[in-house]
């Protein structure tokens, strides 16, 4: 390996991370494992090329081959999600959201998004984020009775505040979202509807979660998470907004696009069109449902009583530990999750009363329902009966699962510390 000889410190860190991914159960809902083909595209010579502008309308010469790549990514994104227009240049989901806002909103305009404390995202109007600083953000949330989105509240807030844009989508909401209802509410006050489908994009591509594309003015997303691509973003819109969106991305919010990442996105979109990916998306949801059911059997409080997606939200208050403690305990056992606030959480975001658990990465490794049943029992034991003996047994079970479902065997044979 060239890197090993040139910079062993970086090489060793990469090798250690490969070993960590291989030897832990990755259950952070926003993480996944890309294919080697996607990594190959992202590590290609396209990283050398500047290509400001759009395909065939560049501000630099020598773009004939990167134009081919970006054209492929655009056409595949449109085909995959049945969209009229696609811009594949945003470097991230946050930048995709920023570009949409800046395309049709002015500073001080009112936006109505899901409360971060109830499962929304920073870029949907959180006060600590640019979206909450530039725009007048109002928040809808979930009902305390069942933790499902309160569409009646959304309607009342829309009528009261007359937002210029309503934002759908979430980072911690396990159930199906009624996009059509959101569009109905948006239309009632003359607002745009933007849906951030970052968490659900792979499930939507696989046909196991409702698509927001037809009913939304704008749809943004990341390409990692359930879509299993590189860490990046893209925007879908109606054709009437195409020019405004493209100008808002460049020169509005970004300079040169990352052509090596766009190549990886093109590969990602092609992979997501396959029958294998549809089966994968279905398995992700089935795994999450079984995981939720088994956790409930073990006395773990699963919010909303289950899931329709790739994630399971757990309220730990009946166990008497915080999300931070749970994250650390499971990490000691070899299971990676993240602490997560639950709706109406009395604890600060640095501690939280819950954790978020996801199945995309383990499903990529080939794990199915039987493995989810085993993992649910491990999680419950570690959370409820924390001891060195419990941890030791959990580590052994995790090791057995990881060895039975190896990750990146080709790389592991090449890279070792």
From Swiss-Prot:
Q: Which residues carry this modification: N6-(pyridoxal phosphate)lysine?
A: 225
Q: Which top-level group of life is the source organism from?
A: Bacteria
Give cofactor(s), names only.
pyridoxal 5'-phosphate
- Give the pathway annotation: One-carbon metabolism; tetrahydrofolate interconversion; Amino-acid biosynthesis; glycine biosynthesis; glycine from L-serine: step 1/1
PROSITE patterns referenced in this protein's UniProt entry, alphabetically: SHMT
User: Mind listing the UniProt keywords for this protein, alphabetically?
Assistant: Amino-acid biosynthesis, Cytoplasm, One-carbon metabolism, Pyridoxal phosphate, Transferase
Q: EC number(s) in its UniProt entry? A: 2.1.2.1
User: Could you confirm whether the keyword Amino-acid biosynthesis appears in this record?
Assistant: yes
Mainly localized where?
A: cytoplasm
- InterPro entries, A to Z: PyrdxlP-dep_Trfase, PyrdxlP-dep_Trfase_major, PyrdxlP-dep_Trfase_small, Ser_HO-MeTrfase, Ser_HO-MeTrfase-like, Ser_HO-MeTrfase_PLP_BS, SHMT-like_dom
Where found?
Answer: Cytoplasm
Question: What is any one GO biological process for this UniProt entry?
Answer: glycine biosynthetic process from serine
Q: What class of enzyme is it?
A: transferase
Give the residues the record marks as binding (6S)-5,6,7,8-tetrahydrofolate. Answer: 116, 120-122
Output the Pfam families linked to this UniProt entry: SHMT
Name the chemical reaction catalysed here. Answer: (6R)-5,10-methylene-5,6,7,8-tetrahydrofolate + glycine + H2O = (6S)-5,6,7,8-tetrahydrofolate + L-serine
Positions bearing the site annotation: Plays an important role in substrate specificity = 224
According to the UniProt record, one GO cellular component term is: cytosol
- Which GO molecular function, any one, fits this protein according to its record? glycine hydroxymethyltransferase activity
Function, as annotated, reads: Catalyzes the reversible interconversion of serine and glycine with tetrahydrofolate (THF) serving as the one-carbon carrier. This reaction serves as the major source of one-carbon groups required for the biosynthesis of purines, thymidylate, methionine, and other important biomolecules. Also exhibits THF-independent aldolase activity toward beta-hydroxyamino acids, producing glycine and aldehydes, via a retro-aldol mechanism.
- Describe the protein's quaternary organization and the partners it interacts with: Homodimer.
Q: Which family does it belong to?
A: Belongs to the SHMT family.
Q: What is this protein called?
A: Serine hydroxymethyltransferase
Q: Which gene encodes it?
A: glyA
